[in-house]
Amino acid sequence: MIFDTEKTAVREDGLKIGYGLIHGNDRIVIIKAGAGGNCIGAEEKYLKMARLLHDTYGCTVLCLSNYANDSFARGDVAVIRELIAEMGGEVELYYIGNSNGSTQGLLTATKYFAFRRMVLVNMPLMLNFHRIKEALTRADTEIRFVYGEGDPSISYVPFLRNASSKEGNLARAEIVTVDGADHNFAGMTDVFIQQCGSVIRD
């Protein structure tokens, strides 16, 4: 199992970037790895997810590495814009983020792109919760949060639920907890892929 296109490069500013692309229709699913992760993922979870989404919906899937906390702004934006231009500009965007990839998606990606739907898995809630709330009220998209019951942020999920019942766009958020799952969904790759696959609902 491989990507149609896979590339790794080092930018002039020293940022290492890597991505894998599967070509499909005008629906683009962007998958952002957790901190330090490559575009394939442990047990090939991002690649497997990308192939499943493509085989099921015919969509284009772009998997992005995550070698820096600001890698989306510094490298990914240009890659995504180039892909959109190559596809003629009329596309529908979806986003899946894992851990820090979720944080970069919510805090940064929503400033650059309009997503129809986002799935954010085990996004850390311990730091800068006020920034998360601000981003949620700003982001005009449907968001599904997924947390493993063993994730360090699970004790903060009630605060997220409370905010989602009171504030603007937060009311559109869906929050799911997964029994038996830790931060990495260790031994539960199939469940991880299943949860993320809900990014498209047709």
Report residues per predicted region:
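Short, surface-exposed "cap/lid" segments of acyl-processing enzymes
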Residues: 13-14, 22-66
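Conserved alpha/beta-hydrolase "acid-adjacent" motif
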Residues: 152-159
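Alpha/beta-hydrolase active-site loop
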Residues: 45, 70-88
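Active-site nucleophile loop of the alpha/beta-hydrolase fold
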Residues: 119-128, 148-150
